[in-house]
């Protein structure tokens, strides 16, 4: 209901592979409704766990709308972990609202706009052989499985401080 308050914020970190952890943030309200949001940001799990604890302290006992207030107040933040956790809190709040109102979230956000959406295969994590041939084999496997859009990140060993020509900036 609109008068329910936040009673718990808890992160769950799931080890999916040696390269991947998924992070979910759960928000529970005083009327027992549980909402879930996703905050995956590899390598930042402990920072996100700490932020979830901090935000639980800040938001516990407050109405769900306090999450929107937090998002607006921190919208200029460049802290990736903070942005990921706040995004997950917003997702969880929409999940809760949908459950409380008995409506799907997409309806709360304005309704169906498209009946079909394109999907892609992210072949980055599955590609153990990081050579060109390895990426090609992964790409072919995805195409053979019916995908016509692919996502990869073949940038192992490159860092943001390296310029386009390979020189340090």
Where are these regions (language model features)?
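Glycine-rich, aromatic-flanked loop segments that form ligand/cofactor-binding clefts
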Residues: 90-130
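Structured beta-strand/loop patches that form or line metal/cofactor-binding pockets in enzymes
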Residues: 2-36, 40-41
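Glycine-rich, charged/polar anion/phosphate-binding loops
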Residues: 10-12, 105, 136-137
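Residues at beta-strand starts and edge strands
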Residues: 21-23, 53, 117
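Structured loop/turn residues at beta-strand edges in well-structured enzyme cores
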Residues: 4, 87, 115, 145
């Amino acid at each position: 209901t609109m008068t329910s308050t936040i009673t718990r914020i808890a992160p769950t970190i799931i080890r999916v592979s040696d390269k991947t952890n998924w992070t979910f943030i759960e928000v529970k309200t005083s009327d027992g409704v549980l909402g879930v949001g996703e905050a995956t940001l590899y390598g930042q799990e402990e920072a996100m766990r700490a932020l979830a604890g901090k935000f639980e302290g800040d938001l516990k006992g407050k109405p769900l709308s306090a999450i929107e207030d937090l998002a607006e107040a921190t919208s200029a933040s460049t802290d990736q972990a903070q942005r990921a956790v706040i995004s997950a809190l917003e997702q969880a709040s929409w999940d809760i609202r949908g459950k409380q109102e008995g409506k799907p979230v997409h309806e709360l956000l304005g309704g169906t706009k498209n009946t079909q959406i394109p999907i892609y295969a992210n072949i980055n994590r599955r590609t153990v052989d990081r050579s060109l041939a390895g990426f090609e084999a992964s790409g072919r496997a995805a195409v053979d499985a019916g995908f016509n859009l692919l996502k990869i990140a073949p940038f192992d060993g490159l860092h943001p401080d390296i310029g386009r020509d390979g020189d340090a900036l």
